[in-house]
C-alpha cells in the first residue's frame, strides 16, 4: 500500500468550473485520457463520462456532485500530480461549486466558444473571486458553428471585468479548426487528421495567413505582461525581447498574484481549443502546471484558537507542521458507505490514527484513506500536506468542519451555505416508506448542507428545502433510486398565523354542566390585548384577589387559553401576540375542577378573540436579487407585482443588488420567472424575516380556502 509524501512544488489542486454545457466534464475526460488515467474517452452525451458517476448525472448529461480525481502530467519531463475537482455548472448546485473552491488552489474556467460568458460563468467567477482563487481560462467548442474566440475574450472583459492575457490564437474556425498558435513560443500546434484522439500534435511554423495577426497579439501579450509585472516592465522599456522562460515566469507571477479581490482586477491567461474534438487539451495541461499555484504558493492557511476565536493560528503547507484538514464533502459510496473528502492543509494523516474534530470537540478515528479517481479508488497508508483524499470511518464529521491534531487544535474557516430558497412537501406512500424516508433524509442532508428538512407541525408534512427545482428533483429521485422510497411530492403550504389588533377589556364566561351526580362549574372574567413589538407570542397575567378562584385552578385557565390559541378563529391558524389577563371569577365547592376552568378559559378566549379585530399574518421573506444593470427595472417591477417592498439598492462587483421584503406565498415559481426575465443572469437568496398583516382582499381568499368555501 502506498505511502505518499509529495513534492508540494509539483502538486496542483484545481477545479474545472463553468456554465452548464460549456464542456467542463468533457474537458476533464480528455485530461484523464491524456494523463493515462482513462483508457477510453468517456462522452457525456452517451452517458459514459468517468467523472459523471451518479445515474442521474449520466441521464441528464450534467454534473451534480464534484467528483475528485488524481492524475499526473509531465512538464519538461518532470512529473506533476494534479488533483482535479469537476464542479457542476447548474445554478441549483452552486453549493457544490462553493465547497470545491474553498479547498482548491487554482481553477480552470471553461467558456463555450459559441455562447461566450454565460450567466453561471459570472456566478462561479464571483465565487472564485470571493475565495481568492487564481485561474486560467479555456475557450472551448471552437469547432462549433458560430464559435468566435475573440468575441469570447471581449466578453471576459465586459461581463467579468477581468483582464485576459491571450496566450493562443485559433488556427481555422468551426469545422476547419485544426490547432492553435502559441504566442509564447511563436509556434503552431497542429493536430493531424490521423490522430483522431488528439494524442499527438505537430509543432510547426505559424501559417503564413496568421503571421501578421500572431505578431499583433504577441505584442498585446508582452504589453499586458509588462503592465502587470515589474521585472517584465524593465525588459520591455529597454526594448529587450524576453526569453520563453522569462515570459512563463512572469505570467506565473501575475496569475498567482491575481486573487480577484475587491480592490484589484483578475488577470487571467486565456487558451483555446475543442475538448470534444481533442484539440488544445495538452497545452492546457502544460498551463495548469506552469501558471496555477502549488500548495506552497498559497499562503499559510489561517484558523482560530478553539478557546479564543480572536486568536489567529496559521498553518504552513508542510508535513512537519501539526496535522490540519478541512472536510469539504461527504459522499455515500454504494460499497464502502460514508466517505469524507478532506483537503490536508498541514502535517501528515495516517490510516488508523485518531484525530480531533475541533468544531464539535469530538475525537474521530481515520479508517482507510483513498486516493479517488471519479468513482474508482486506490487505498493508501498515509498522506501529507497539500493533498486531497477521501477517508472512511468518520462518524460525526460533516461538511465544512475541521479535523486536526488533538494536541494542537485549530478551527479553520468553514464554508457558508445559503439557506434553501424553495421547499416542497413530501409524503411517504406507506409505513415502510416512512422508515426508509428517515434514513434517506439523514444521509442526503449529511452529504448536502443546502438540503434542509423540517416537519411542519401544523400540516404534519415533511418539508424539504433546497437551492432550486432541479436540486429537489434530483434529491427526490435519489430517494427513490438509492433508498427505494416511494413518496408523493406536493406543493408546500404557507404557515400563516392569526393575531388580534384591539384590546377587549372584559369577557365574562361561565361554564356550567349538570348531568346528575357531580356537575361542572367555572366562572372567569378575562381581558385580551395585543402584545406590541417584541417576540412574545403569548403572555398570561393573573390579577385575581381574595381567593375568588382557588390558586390550583388558575394554571388551568392559562392552559385553556393556550389551547384555544392553537387554532385561530379566522382560518384555524395558530394565534400569536396575545396577552390574557385573568381579572375575576367564581367557583363551586363541589362542582369546580381543573377541567371546568380549562374549558372556561378556552371558551372565554375564543369569545374575546372574535371581538378583538382578528387579522391574518403571513411570513415575509428578506429577498436579495443580484442582477446585471440591464435587467434592474424588470426585477424591481416583478418584485412589486408580488406585493414586495423594495428596501435598498446597491452596487456589488459590477452587478446591482436589490433588497426587499416579499410575502412567501408570492415567491413560489420565482426561480423560473427570474431566470426567464434575466436570461438566467440574475441570482437570488431569501430568508425568513418576520410576520406581517395580510391585506384584506388576500386574507378573504385565504380564509375562504381554509374553510373549504
Curated annotation (Swiss-Prot):
SMART domains: EFG_C (SM00838), EFG_IV (SM00889). Its main location: cytoplasm. This is Elongation factor G. One of its GO terms (cellular component) is cytoplasm. GTP binds at residues 18-25, 86-90, 140-143. Catalyzes the GTP-dependent ribosomal translocation step during translation elongation. During this step, the ribosome changes from the pre-translocational (PRE) to the post-translocational (POST) state as the newly formed A-site-bound peptidyl-tRNA and P-site-bound deacylated tRNA move to the P and E sites, respectively. Catalyzes the coordinated movement of the two tRNA molecules, the mRNA and conformational changes in the ribosome. Keywords: Cytoplasm, Elongation factor, GTP-binding, Nucleotide-binding, Protein biosynthesis. It comes from Streptomyces griseus subsp. griseus (strain JCM 4626 / CBS 651.72 / NBRC 13350 / KCC S-0626 / ISP 5235). It comes from the Bacteria. SUPFAM superfamilies: EF-G C-terminal domain-like, P-loop containing nucleoside triphosphate hydrolases, Ribosomal protein S5 domain 2-like, Translation proteins. Belongs to the TRAFAC class translation factor GTPase superfamily. Classic translation factor GTPase family. EF-G/EF-2 subfamily. The gene is fusA. GO terms for molecular function: GTP binding; GTPase activity; translation elongation factor activity. One of its GO terms (biological process) is ribosome disassembly. PROSITE patterns: G_TR_1, G_TR_2. Residues 9-296 form the tr-type G domain. InterPro entries: EF-G-like_DII, EFG_II, EFG_III, EFG_III/V, EFG_IV, EFG_V, EFG_V-like, G_TR_CS. It is found in: Cytoplasm.
